[in-house]
Amino acid sequence: MSTCGNCDCVDKSQCVKKGNSYGIDIVETEKSYVDEVIVAAEAAEHDGKCKCGAACACTDCKCGN
């Protein structure tokens, strides 16, 4: 996952930045792949903008493109 420099999260490393495409990295295990697909789907719900990851404390992460 990449970080978002303009994310409102306290821990910017928990912010996921997705563009217009579903760039999914297949990691070592099937579980990791499923997690990435879920993250991509959640990001798509927010118009492809950054969204806090599951471990981020904030609930309304507002990132620009």
Curated annotation (Swiss-Prot):
GO terms of molecular function? copper ion binding; zinc ion binding
Query: Which BP terms from GO are recorded?
Result: cellular detoxification; intracellular copper ion homeostasis
Give the residue range of the signal peptide. none
Q: Which UniProt keywords apply?
A: Metal-binding, Metal-thiolate cluster
Q: What does this protein do?
A: Metallothioneins have a high content of cysteine residues that bind various heavy metals.
Entry similarity comment: Belongs to the metallothionein superfamily. Type 15 family.
What protein am I looking at? Metallothionein-like protein type 3
